[in-house]
């Protein structure tokens, strides 16, 4: 199990001071929905509303990308990730790329 990692979308962590910035880190996931899933989703898109199959796939992909980000930051020696963000893009018509990225840092409680 990974040691505890503080992940924030801000530049600083309240109550902590930054000891060292280690640099950028990221976690990337590319997901594809199979032909059957695309067919069902396309039928649902005709009616309108949320397409639950894609929502679930993207939520899982974000969690997976965040897990990879934490793993990569840990391997760099970080105990925190600051300025964390998500980005996404379509690859072709059937794949989605999800990227979680931020700055790996070493922090300690403020004195």
From Swiss-Prot:
S-S pairs = none
Q: Known Pfam families for this protein? A: YbjQ_1
- As given in the record, the signal peptide range reads none
HAMAP family reported for this sequence: UPF0145
| Sequence similarity | Belongs to the UPF0145 family.
List where the protein spans the membrane. Answer: none
What InterPro entries does the record point to? Answer: UPF0145_dom_sf (IPR035439), UPF0145_YbjQ-like (IPR002765)
Q: Which Gene3D superfamilies match?
A: Hypothetical protein apc22750. Chain B
Species the sequence originates in: Bradyrhizobium sp. (strain ORS 278)
Organism superkingdom: Bacteria
Give the protein's recorded name. Answer: UPF0145 protein BRADO6695
């Amino acid at each position: 199990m990974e040691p505890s990692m503080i992940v924030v979308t801000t530049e600083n962590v309240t109550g902590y001071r930054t000891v060292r910035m280690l640099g950028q880190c990221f976690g990337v996931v590319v997901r594809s929905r199979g032909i059957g899933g695309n067919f069902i989703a396309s039928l649902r898109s005709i009616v309108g509303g949320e397409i639950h199959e894609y929502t679930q796939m993207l939520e899982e992909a974000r969690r997976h990308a965040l897990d990879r980000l934490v793993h990569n930051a840990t391997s760099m020696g970080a105990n925190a990730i600051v300025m964390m963000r998500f980005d996404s893009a379509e690859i072709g018509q059937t794949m989605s790329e999800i990227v979680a990225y931020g700055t790996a840092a070493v922090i300690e409680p403020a004195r």
